[in-house]
A protein has these predicted regions:
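Catalytic phosphate/metal-binding cores of nucleic-acid and nucleotide-processing enzymes, i.e., regions
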Residues: 8-10, 41-43, 90-94
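Ser/Thr/Gly-rich flexible loops in soluble cytosolic domains mediating phosphotransfer, phosphorylation
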Residues: 67-94
Length: 94
């Protein structure tokens, strides 16, 4: 399973990836808007939006690309490790 995490804190990117590995998920983390962002998303199983620390432009770009590719979008207001872990538990359970 693969996920794209959009938002969160720059300094926690590595920790987000480590938690995803714990649930056997490959992860890409985008904490800021990057050039050719839409191309870099790829085709993950889910896009997780950590909405409290992310620009509106990045959220809109991620949502638009996910809708275009029919990818599940999960919004989470918090960007803590425990909240990400809860989201991953729900994804793995389904």
């Amino acid at each position: 399973m693969s996920v794209v995490i959009v938002g969160g804190h720059d300094r926690m990117s590595k920790q987000y990836i480590d938690i995803c590995k714990k649930y056997n998920c490959k992860a890409k983390v985008f904490t800021q808007m990057e050039t050719r962002f839409r191309d870099k998303i790829g085709n993950p199983d889910a896009v997780i939006l950590l909405t409290n620390v992310v620009s509106h432009k990045l959220v809109l770009a991620a949502k638009k690309e996910a809708d275009k590719k029919q990818i599940t979008v999960i919004r989470n207001h918090k960007s803590t490790l425990s909240s990400l872990e809860n989201v991953l538990q729900q994804i793995v359970a389904n």
